[in-house]
Each structure stands twice: as C-alpha cells, then as structure tokens.
Regions:
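Conserved class I S-adenosyl-L-methionine
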Residues: 6-82, 84-93, 100, 120, 182-213
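Class I SAM-dependent methyltransferase SAM/SAH-binding core
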Residues: 94-143
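A conserved beta-strand element that flanks and buttresses the S-adenosyl-L-methionine
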Residues: 155
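Short catalytic micro-motifs in class I SAM-dependent methyltransferases
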Residues: 158-159
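A short glycine-rich, Lys/Arg-flanked "PGG" loop and its adjoining helix->strand segment in the class I
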Residues: 167-179
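A C-terminal cap/extension of S-adenosyl-L-methionine-dependent methyltransferases
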Residues: 229, 235-239, 249-311
Length: 311
C-alpha cells in the first residue's frame, strides 16, 4: 500500500515522479541569478552527471529528452544556416546540444551558470575533437557576455521553466540575435496531459486543486529543497516574445508522462514508454486533443527586422 503523504511532501513528490532523480538531486539547465535562481544553480551544479546520463537512459524521462534533442536538431537543419555559422547555446547543460550543433558544422558559444556543467561541456568537446568549434564559459542568461546582433540562432533547452524572470531572459536572448535571427527554446506546458489526468493536478477538479494550491505556488511545482519549476501557456509565451521584439514561427508539444496519481508514478516503466510512444506519434501527426497536451513545448521564434523592443 502506498504511504500517505503529508502536504509538504506532496509538493515535493511530483517532481520525483516526473524525474526519477529529482528527489535526490534535481538538475536544471539554466543560467540564472535571484535567490530561487541561486538554489536552482546549486542543484544543477550537483547534478551534472545525471543530466549527462539522461540522454542515454531507457525510461520515459530519458526518451522525452532524447526526442527533444532530435526534434531540436531537425528544426535547426531546416533553417538552412550556412556552415560555420556562429550560434549560441544558452543553458548548455551537459553540452549535448552544443556537440550536436558542432557536429553539423556550426561554431558554438555555450554558456551555463553551473561551472560543473561548463566543465562537462568542455570535456565532451575535447573528447569529441570539437574544441575548435565549441567555446564554453560560465555566464548568466540575464546578462549574456555578447554584443547585440551576435548570432543568427540561439538555442535554450530546459531553461525557461526554472527562471524567476523568463521575460528578462527572452529579452536578453533577443538582444544578442541578429535582425530576423531565430530563437529555439522549450517551455513547460501548463496543460500537459499527465496533469489533466491526475485528480491532484487536474484543473477540472477545483476542490482538489484548491488544496494543492495550499502547498504549491500557482502555475509552479515546488520540488526538493524549495526549487520551483514554472509552467506556461502558449499565450504567455507569445506575450514574452512580443515584448522582446519577436514572434512565434512554429511550435509543437511533446512528452507524455510519466503519468501519476496523487503525485506517484501510476504506470510501470515499460507501459509508460509504450503510452508515450503512441501518444507522441499522434501528437506529431497533429491529432486534435493530443497535439497540444505534451509535457513541454518546443518553440521557434524569429526576431523582428525592426530593432525596437517594447519596454
């Protein structure tokens, strides 16, 4: 029998159900700076090896991240950037996206707030013989160490959900993009299917949601040691982009699971993987009702050719 959780434990355990190593050391791919942001960086620093392993794990959480990287690279290739283009990986984490872009002939500037992640990216670049194509450094996403109009493309995977001020980050990313440059990033979906089906998180069940709101911030999941992740709607993302002088070009939702009940994983891993694969195929095919309820959004935005950014 499952052990009943105290309210404070409930707030923590959802992130553990979604990410098997979150309770131990939740990692975050972010480059940041308020008090909450600093706690995120500290945890991220301690979880560098876990974020390296996630791209080879054979479970739902691993498959979602592997699919995220695959879709990201496919979208980048479709942009048709010239060989040798200088691109930004903001919140590079373990460096997997940086490596993939370098392998495709791009010159990558990789930044992250966590020194251990930067070291891991540098190690991977050296091991792959890509030192000349990847420059990795510790830097904050709120104040990037680049002049304006530096890049035709900026990539930021797994960063926005962990930021206290996503607007400031997106505005700063826009600043370093060239006019008509692209920003490719992810955000967590507030209306993900896994949450809609769990009565403890479903917005359709107002009384239970009111109870959950006593232990969670609205639109946030508070994880271990007070770390919060933030979920957004596409309308909110569009507002962030518009304020930063950008517009959304395309988006998809992806990632189905792990499914939970009362913040506990509800399906055996092998069944969860099959459910994810089936639902992801439907979402990729644009199936109504499924295409918009994945766990994350992958979003491609383009900077306006006008240099003005709304204040």
């Amino acid at each position: 029998m499952s052990q009943a959780l105290e309210p404070a434990q409930m707030a923590m355990s959802y992130s553990s159900a979604v990410d098997p190593f979150a309770q131990k050391r939740p990692g975050v791919e972010a480059v940041i700076g308020s008090s909450d942001d600093e706690r995120v960086v500290a945890h991220f620093d301690s979880a560098a090896l876990d974020w390296k392993k996630i791209y080879s794990r054979r479970d739902v959480w691993g498959i979602i991240h592997q699919d995220r990287l695959s879709k990201t690279m496919a979208w980048i290739e479709a942009l048709g950037l010239p060989q040798g283009a200088r691109v930004l990986d903001a919140g590079c984490g373990a460096g997997l996206a940086s490596l993939a872009m370098a392998h495709r002939g791009y010159e990558v500037e990789a930044v992250d707030a966590a020194a251990s992640m930067v070291a891991l990216t540098q190690q991977h670049a050296s091991q792959g013989g890509l030192d000349a194509r990847i420059s990795a450094r510790v830097a904050g996403i709120y104040k990037l160490p680049f002049v304006q109009h530096s890049f035709p493309l900026a990539v930021s995977l797994g960063v926005i959900p962990w930021l206290e001020d996503p607007q400031q980050a997106i505005t700063e990313l826009s600043r370093v993009l060239q006019p008509a440059g692209y920003l490719l990033f992810t955000a967590d979906n507030r209306r993900r299917l896994a949450w809609l089906l769990d009565p403890f998180t479903s917005p359709a069940l107002r009384p239970i949601k009111n109870f959950v709101n006593m232990v969670m911030r609205r639109s946030q999941t508070r994880g271990w040691d007070g770390i919060c992740s933030h979920q957004h709607s596409i309308a909110e993302i569009d507002a962030f982009l518009s304020h930063a002088g950008m517009k959304r070009v395309r988006f998809i939702s992806f990632g189905f699971g792990p499914f939970t009940f009362a913040y506990r994983k509800a399906l055996p891993e092998w069944i969860g993987m099959q459910v994810h694969n089936i639902l992801q195929r439907l979402a990729d095919a644009g199936f109504p009702g499924i295409r918009s309820v994945g766990a994350q959004y992958l979003i491609l935005a383009q900077k306006n050719t006008s240099l003005s950014i709304s204040k």
